[in-house]
Amino acid sequence: TFGFQVTSRLDNGLGRTGIIHTPHGDIETPAFIVVGTKASVKALTPDQLTDLGAQAVLANAYHLFLQPGHDLVDEAGGVGQFMAWDGPTFTDSGGFQVLSLGAGFKKTLAMDVSQLTEADVIAADRDRKAMVDDGGVTFRSPLNGDLHRFTPEVSMSIQHRLGADVMMAFDELTTLFNTRAYQEEALERTRRWAERCLAEHRRLSAERAERPYQALYGVIQGAQY
């Protein structure tokens, strides 16, 4: 079963604690979700994660799509079994990685860009490897240059095959140097993509009804605005 239970609220209503119930265990919120990008948390074993109090692990749909492939992870029993982690798992949609790697972002990212220039954020001397349109994102693999295309439907298909308890809707990543007009355009595109993700998620959930239920979470966008 899957669900969310509120356990307490602040008097002003601006904060709460709760419990997310998943097929692989409960998550007390607010929670730090450990990042295991390629279905592996660097330098820590699953047992060590448990000893440290980790409640859940997040893997990356984009990276697992490229290597070793979501079909292989599916055949292994899903991302949890693939990484020998028996607790709750999350996957993100791949949108951030597709677009950030495509633009060649540096590590300099901040909400206050008054003292920054585009050169501080966008890596120099790199061709843009990702192009966005209303249908999705076309990009080249940084591994071998192969051309791929992610759409909301493709992201949902990959994440269903990865089998995490919680999946993320496919969204468009923008930079703090995009104009407000473009941010609004991208936000509306992300909203439409979320609707497409939900429709495909429902279709795949019915098609794979024998599998444990996977939840779909939305992504809040809007950049600095």
Question: What do these predicted regions represent?
Answer:
Residues E210-P212:
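Short, flexible hinge/linker loops that cap or flank conserved catalytic cores
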Residues T1-R208:
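Non-catalytic, usually N-terminal nucleic-acid engagement modules in DNA/RNA processing proteins
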